[in-house]
């Protein structure tokens, strides 16, 4: 795999992770269970962090 294909693949991966994080935040807004809300927001933060790491490589 060449360098540009690798960079594109990382960008797509980071985008998917950010999309999942966004969906977790949306679900957190919909739920009325505080523990579930906290867990979804924690997952969203972890996904955002991973996306940021992917985009920097």
Model-found features: residue ranges?
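Long, non-catalytic architectural segments outside compact domain cores
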Residues: 1-57
């Amino acid at each position: 795999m060449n360098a540009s294909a690798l960079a594109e693949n990382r960008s797509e991966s980071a985008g998917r992770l950010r999309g999942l994080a966004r969906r977790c935040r949306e679900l957190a807004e919909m739920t009325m269970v505080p523990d579930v809300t906290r867990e979804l927001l924690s997952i969203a933060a972890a996904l955002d962090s991973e996306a940021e790491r992917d985009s920097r490589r």
